[in-house]
Amino acid sequence: MGNYPEAAFKLILIILCISGLLYANSSSERTFSITRPPVEKDIVEETLIDLQAPKERVSSLNRWIRSASGVTQVDPMLLVCLLHTESRFRKEAVSEKGYRGEAQTKRFSEFSSVNILEGAEILRDKLSLSKGDMFEALARYKGGKDKEEARKQAREVLKLYKIQLERRGLWNRQ
């Protein structure tokens, strides 16, 4: 019975992820609601390619990031930049502290879609706690808003985010 809570948690995350995929593929897709309106071209896929995500995973990563964004309402471009800095999109990545997966979270699943959703939910919660302040939320995600290393890593994500938006002509919409 000791694994019951973990198994239940994984099942809930999988259900949320599947519902997010259904939502993200519906005609009412609203995946860019936090920072900007949707755009016509697939900037998430372009950004994954630009940031050298493994070619064989670009399509799947794009779907999973859009799904997680649909569930959490966190900007998918911000998620792409966060995942790049956390793991370079590698499922097998493990941090010095033992965090695992693409989003480098405490909870790890064999399913990348669940790992990405977990990271998006954590970031959403950090954004809420930080009253929408992206820098503070990212610093909290990276280890603590008052820790210099976490603040440095948060600046790295925001710099990458700005560069990617500028490359796609979207920075002025901020």
Per-segment meaning from a language model:
Residues 15-16, 65:
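Small-residue packing motifs within transmembrane alpha-helices
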Residues 17-24:
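Hydrophobic h-region of N-terminal signal peptides that target proteins for export
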Residues 26-174:
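Catalytic glycan-binding domains that act on GlcNAc-containing polysaccharides
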